[in-house]
Amino acid sequence: MILRAEHLVKTYKKRSVVKGISVEVNQGEIVGLLGPNGAGKTTSFYMIVGLVKPNSGNIYLDDMNITDFPMYKRAQQGIGYLAQEASVFRKLSIEDNILSVLQLTKLSKAEQIIKMESLIDEFGLEHIRTNRGDLLSGGERRRTEIARCLATDPKFILLDEPFAGVDPVAVEDIQRIVAQLKNKNIGILITDHNVQETLAITDKTYLMFEGGILKAGIPEELVEDEMVRRVYLGQNFELRKKKLEF
């Protein structure tokens, strides 16, 4: 499957924030959407998520036009979303956080338990499975949120600032999890201010500037582009690609 946005435009009070951008994410691919503050990347990301309605342009899941779908309908079609803000239920344990989503599926009670156990094991949450959401570290919270998102077997996951509020020691853990999602043939779209951490794991990246796409390509191509360095990365930026083991 392919998730694609075509010619998205967004204006606020006659000010053009997004000027006809197009973005494409395939299953089994990690795609970055980056840019300096004010470039329009967050607005573009939110249009793809379904939080903001474009003035023109369309969003497709394969050949299905989902531009007017509310977020819950996009979720039903296999598009998961993880917000930057904490979304775990603070007073529920990790177990109950995951079960709360599984209970909305068509799985039987027994199948829900099996799925929960599988996700807890996969994301290394066994030792804290009974801990409440408000007692988790940033990295533990992110792992729980991603595990809960996978409870509905999404085809795509849209990650808003996945490295925000995460200790440096946990960044590689999150990167490894995102790589695992790719191996499950899930398409990933990431927007984040942490450029190095994002470019280290993306297959391709769209770099926005002043409402448009300045450059799109593999991270190595972006880093070598003089305009990209001048307006965003800086002349001393060095790409550190990661080969993550899991």
Regions found by a protein language model. Give the residues of each.
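The feature captures the beta-strand-to-loop junction immediately N-terminal to the Walker
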Residues: 34-36
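Conserved ABC ATPase "signature" region
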Residues: 110-128, 175-179
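Conserved catalytic motifs of ABC-family nucleotide-binding domains
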Residues: 153
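Conserved ABC ATPase signature
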Residues: 132-136, 140
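Helix-to-loop junction immediately C-terminal to a conserved catalytic motif
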Residues: 49
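Catalytic Walker B motif of ABC-type/P-loop ATPase nucleotide-binding domains
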Residues: 157-161
